[in-house]
Curated annotation (Swiss-Prot):
Family statement drawn from the similarity comment of this UniProt entry: Belongs to the GPAT/DAPAT family.
SMART domains: PlsC (SM00563)
Primary location class: membrane
Organism taxonomic ancestry: Bacteria, Pseudomonadati, Pseudomonadota, Gammaproteobacteria, Alteromonadales
Keyword Transcription regulation annotated: no
Catalysis: reaction(s): sn-glycerol 3-phosphate + an acyl-CoA = a 1-acyl-sn-glycero-3-phosphate + CoA
MF term (GO), any: glycerol-3-phosphate O-acyltransferase activity
GO cellular component, one term: plasma membrane
Protein name: Glycerol-3-phosphate acyltransferase
Keyword Cell inner membrane: yes
Keyword annotations: Acyltransferase, Cell inner membrane, Cell membrane, Lipid biosynthesis, Lipid metabolism, Membrane, Phospholipid biosynthesis, Phospholipid metabolism, Transferase
UniProt xrefs under InterPro entries: GPAT/DHAPAT (IPR022284), GPAT/DHAPAT_C (IPR045520), GPAT/DHAPAT_LPLAT (IPR041728), GPAT_PlsB (IPR028354), Plipid/glycerol_acylTrfase (IPR002123)
Membrane topology label: Peripheral membrane protein
Length: 807
C-alpha cells in the first residue's frame, strides 16, 4: 500500500474530497457496536482498493479511530492496519489470491499465542459506491456501475457517477483472542476466518442493496403462470360468464394497479430531497433499536415492518431512516387513495404497492394481491404495512385490521422457508401537520380526498416541527409464534395443505394485538408529549412554570427508574429543558405576573394537544391510577391498590394495548419510587406527604377521564344487569356526551363509539356482560370507580343512570 503522504494518495484524496460524500453506518459505531478504543484494532475488507481505503481514512479521522494507513504494531510485529480478503482486480487478467490475507492472519494469531493478555479487535468494513441492487435482466448500466468486484477503470466510473452515494459500514468486532483460545492458531483457523468473512460480506451486501430487481412485465408473466392465479382466472371466467382471456386481462389490470415499480435512481434522488426536507422540518430524528433489525436482515430473516400510522409523513420517514441505517427501503402497502398523479407514480417507483380499502368479496383481486405478496416474500423484499388501516385521528392506536397480517401468516403456512419476522415500529412527532384536519373530521367534517392540491397546501405549512422519533419494537418471528399457538401446525398442513385450520383466525387476532402492544412498548416520551400530559391534567390547562418543571422531573424519573419496557425511549434533559423545548415549538404559551411565569395551553389548542398526550398515555396510566388511589384515600394499603389496578387492568390493556406482565411487581416498584421521592410515607399504611400532594394530584389527573368512562359503564351494568352489548355501547356513548357537556370534557376519544365497542367486547370476554345473577364483581368495580371520581362527576353519572330516560 502506498504511504499516506505519497503524492499519489494525496492526489486521490483530493479528488475524493470533491467527488465523494460518505455516509457512515451505523452513525455511532462506538455506541452501536461496542468498539473498545483501549484495545488494538484492525480493519477487514473484502477487496483491496485504494479508493475504498481513502474513503475509510476520511471516516476514521472524523470518528477518532486508527487510520487505515497506520501499521498495526503489536509486540514488535508490524502488520497492515487493513487486511483484505482478495487483491485488486487488474484491468486484464486475474486478481491476486488470498495468500497475503492468510499470512497476515497467521502473524496476528501467532502474536496472540505468545501474549495471553493480547486481544486484537477485527472490525469488518464494507464500502458501497451507490446501492444499486442490479436487475434480473442485467443492463449496460449494470455492467458499468453495478458489479460487485470492479476493475480500477470501472471503479473510476463508479466514483464519478455514484461518489455522492458512498456508504461505509462497520460491523461488530471479532475478538482474535476468542478465536485463538477457542479454535487454535494454525492455518486451518485462518482459512476458516476467510470463509466466515466472505459469507459475512456477501450477506452484508444483500442487506445494504437488497435482492435483484425484477423486470415488471416478466414478474407479471411469472405470477400469471402460478397455479393459484390460473385457478382464480378460470373461476372468474366461469362466475362472470366471460372468456379466460378476458379474465386474464382483468388480472393483468389488477396487477398493474397493485404492483410497485421500484427504481433505485428515484430512491437516490428522493434521498437528496428528503435530506433537505428533514433538515428544514426537524431539528433531529431520534432512532432506537435499528442495530437489532439490521442483524435480523443479516441473519436472513424476511422482514415485515408494521408501524403505527400518525401521518402521511410515515411513508417517507421510515423508508428514509432504513436507507440511512444501511437497510433497503421496504415495499410499502399504500391505500389506493394515494394513487393520484403525480404522487402515485412517484410512490410506486419508491416501492409502494397499492391496496384497496376493501376487497368486497372480489376473489380474483384477492388472489392477485395474495400472489403478489407471496412473490415479494419469496424474492426477499422487505415489506411494510400499517395494521391500523388508516391514520389515527386521536393519537391512540386504532384497533388493528387483520387482513394483511392474515395474508402474511398464510404465506408462512404455504411454505416460506426463511424466518418471517414482524417488526413493530413506533413513529412519533413533536408536530403532526394533519392534527387540525383530524379534529375537523372528528367533529363531523367530511374527509377530503387526497389530491395534488393537498400536497401543495401541506408544503405551504412546512415549518419548525421539532423532532421525529423512530423506535423499533420487539420483533415477532411468525414461525416461532405459530409454534407457540399451534405446536403441530406443520404436521397439520402436511396432512391437508388446503385446509383452513380452526386455530388460524384466533391466532391472527392474538398476533395483531401483540403487534399493537409491542408498538406501544416502544413509545417515545418527548418534550411535547410529556408537557401535554402534565398540562392537560391540570384544571385550567395551566401551571406555574416551576411546578410544571418539577412535575416533568418526576415523570422523567418514573420512566427511567421504573421503565415501561426496555424498548421505550425517554427525552434527554430535565424538566426545565423539556418546557423550554415545547415553548420554542410554539406549542405552549407563557405569561408572567409578579409571582412568576405561567405555562399554559391556549383554549383553541387544547383539543389538538390531546393528540400528543394520547401518544404516551399508556406509559403513565397505571402510575396515574395508583396516584388516584393514594389521593382519594387518607390511608391505603399496597394490597388494596394492587387489587384495584388488577380489576381495571384488563380494560386498560384492551383500550391502550398494554403489555405489563407482572402487575403486582410493577405497582410495588412505582410505590417504592413514590416513597423514595418523598411523595408518600409507609408504616402500616401508605399516606400522602402533604407538601408534595399536588404532584400526585396532578399525576392522578391523567387517568380521570378513563375512570369516568369505566364508571359510566359499570354503573349502567350494575343498574341494568341484563343489558345487551349494543344497548351498553349506545347508552354509554349517550351518557358520555352528557357528562362531557356538563363538565367540559373535550378529548375526542371520550366520545369515540368504537372505543365503547372495544370495551364492551372485553367486558363480555371477562364475564361482566352475562346472564349470571351474581353481579358482585360488577358492583365492586363500580364502587371502586365511583370512589376515585370527583364528587360532582360521580353525582352526574349516578343521577343520569338512575334517571327515567336512561333506565
Amino acid at each position: 500500500m502506498p504511504k499516506q503522504d505519497s503524492l499519489w494518495l494525496k492526489s486521490l484524496r483530493w479528488i475524493q474530497k470533491h467527488l465523494v460524500h460518505t455516509i457512515v453506518v451505523p452513525q455511532d459505531p462506538f455506541a452501536d457496536l461496542n468498539l473498545d478504543t483501549s484495545r488494538p484494532l484492525a480493519y477487514v475488507m473484502k477487496t483491496e482498493s485504494l479508493s475504498d481505503i481513502a474513503a475509510l481514512s476520511e471516516v476514521t479521522e472524523k470518528l477518532g479511530l486508527p487510520s487505515p494507513y497506520e501499521p498495526l504494531v503489536v509486540n514488535g510485529v508490524v502488520a497492515p492496519r487493513v487486511v483484505c480478503l482478495q487483491g485488486r482486480k487488474p484491468l486484464f487478467g486475474e486478481r491476486a489470491g488470498n495468500e497475503p490475507f492468510l499470512e497476515c492472519f497467521m502473524r496476528l494469531l501467532a502474536v496472540h499465542k505468545e501474549r495471553p493478555e493480547l486481544d486484537i479487535q477485527l472490525v469488518p468494513v464494507s464500502l458501497y459506491w451507490g446501492r444499486t441492487p442490479g436487475k434480473e435482466d442485467d443492463t449496460m448500466k449494470a455492467a458499468v456501475l453495478e458489479r460487485e468486484n470492479p476493475t480500477w477503470l470501472r471503479k473510476c466510473f463508479m466514483i464519478l457517477f455514484l461518489g455522492r452515494h458512498n456508504f461505509v459500514q462497520f460491523s461488530n468486532a471479532v475478538s482474535l483472542r476468542y478465536m485463538a483460545d477457542e479454535h487454535g492458531t494454525d492455518m486451518g483457523i485462518a482459512h476458516k476466518l476467510a470463509r466466515v468473512a466472505r459469507v459475512h460480506f456477501r450477506r452484508q451486501r444483500k442487506v445494504m442493496t437488497g435482492p435483484l430487481l425484477p423486470n415488471r412485465q416478466a414478474l407479471f408473466d411469472s405470477l400469471l403462470k402460478s397455479e393459484s392465479l390460473r385457478k382464480a382466472i378460470q373461476e372468474e371466467a366461469v362466475s362472470k360468464k366471460i372468456s379466460e382471456t378476458q379474465a386474464r386481462e382483468t388480472a393483468i389490470e389488477y396487477l398493474d394497479e397493485i404492483a410497485a415499480n421500484y427504481s433505485d435512481s428515484l430512491v437516490r434522488i428522493a434521498e437528496r430531497f428528503l435530506t433537505w426536507l428533514w433538515n428544514k422540518l426537524y431539528s433531529g430524528i431520534n432512532i432506537k433499536g435499528a442495530e437489532h433489525i439490521r442483524q435480523l436482515h443479516h441473519d436472513g430473516h424476511e422482514i415485515v415492518y408494521v408501524p403505527c400510522h400518525r401521518s402521511h409523513m410515515d411513508y417517507l420517514l421510515l423508508s428514509y431512516i432504513l436507507y440511512y441505517q444501511g437497510m433497503v427501503p421496504p415495499h410499502i402497502a399504500a391505500g389506493i387513495n394515494l394513487n393520484f398523479w403525480p404522487a402515485g407514480p412517484l410512490f410506486r417507483r419508491g416501492g409502494a404497492f397499492f391496496i384497496r380499502r376493501s376487497f368486497n368479496g372480489n376473489k380474483l383481486y384477492t388472489a392477485v394481491f395474495r400472489e403478489y405478496l407471496d412473490q415479494l416474500f419469496a424474492k426477499g423484499y422487505s415489506v411494510e404495512y400499517f395494521s391500523e388501516g388508516g391514520r389515527s385521528r386521536t393519537g391512540r392506536l386504532l384497533a388493528p385490521k387483520t387482513g394483511m397480517i392474515a395474508m402474511t401468516m398464510n404465506s408462512v403456512l404455504r411454505g416460506i422457508e426463511r424466518p418471517v419476522t414482524l417488526v413493530p415500529v413506533y413513529l412519533g412527532y413533536d408536530h403532526v401537520m394533519e392534527v387540525a384536519t383530524y379534529h375537523k373530521e372528528l367533529s363531523g367534517k367530511k374527509k377530503q380526498k387526497e389530491s395534488v392540491w393537498q400536497v401543495f397546501g401541506a408544503i405551504r405549512k412546512l415549518g419548525n416541527f421539532g423532532q421525529g422519533y423512530v423506535n423499533f419494537g420487539e420483533p415477532i418471528t411468525l414461525q416461532t409464534f405459530l409454534n407457540e399457538m399451534a405446536p403441530n401446525w406443520r404436521a397439520e398442513l402436511a396432512d391437508d395443505p388446503e385446509q383452513k385450520p380452526t386455530w388460524l383466525t384466533p391466532a391472527v387476532n392474538v398476533l395483531a394485538n401483540r403487534v399493537m402492544t409491542r408498538i406501544n412498548d416502544a413509545a417515545a416520551a418527548s418534550s411535547v408529549t410529556l408537557t401535554s400530559l402534565a398540562l392537560l391534567a391540570s384544571e385550567q390547562n395551566a401551571l406555574e412554570r416551576c411546578l410544571l418543571e418539577r412535575q416533568l422531573d418526576l415523570y422523567l424519573t418514573l420512566l427511567k427508574r421504573v421503565p415501561y419496557t426496555s424498548f421505550t425511549s425517554v427525552a434527554e434533559g430535565d424538566g426545565k429543558h423539556l418546557v423550554q423545548q415545547g415553548i420554542n415549538l410554539n406549542k405552549f404559551s407563557v405569561s408572567s405576573d409578579p409571582l412568576g411565569e405561567i405555562v399554559s395551553i391556549d383554549a383553541n389548542q387544547a383539543i389538538s394537544m390531546t393528540y400528543y398526550r394520547n401518544n404516551i398515555i399508556h406509559l403513565f396510566i397505571i402510575p396515574s391510577l395508583i396516584a388516584s388511589c393514594l389521593t382519594h384515600n387518607e390511608q391505603s394499603q399496597r394490597q388494596q391498590i394492587v387489587a384495584i389496578v388488577n380489576d381495571f387492568y384488563p380494560l386498560l390493556k384492551a383500550e391502550l394495548f398494554m403489555g405489563i406482565k407482572d402487575i403486582p411487581s410493577y405497582v410495588n416498584q412505582v410505590l417504592d419510587l413514590f416513597i423514595e421521592q418523598g411523595l408518600i410515607t409507609e408504616s402500616d399504611n401508605l399516606s400522602v406527604v402533604t407538601e408534595h400532594s399536588s404532584q400526585l394530584v396532578l399525576l392522578s389527573g391523567s387517568v380521570s377521564e378513563t375512570l369516568q368512562r369505566y364508571a359510566i359503564i359499570f354503573n349502567l351494568l350494575a343498574h341494568r344487569p341484563k343489558m345487551e352489548r349494543s344497548e351498553l355501547e349506545s347508552e354509554s356513548h349517550l351518557l358520555a356526551q352528557r357528562l362531557g357537556a356538563l363538565h367540559g370534557i373535550t378529548a375526542p376519544e371520550f366520545y369515540d363509539k368504537k372505543l365503547y365497542g372495544t370495551l364492551s367486547v372485553k367486558l363480555k370476554e371477562l364475564g361482566y356482560l352475562s346472564d349470571k345473577d351474581d353481579k358482585s364483581d360488577v358492583k365492586r368495580i363500580r364502587d371502586q370507580a365511583n370512589s376515585l371520581l370527583r364528587a360532582s362527576v360521580r353525582q352526574t353519572i349516578v343521577a343520569s343512570v338512575t334517571a327515567e330516560h336512561i333506565s
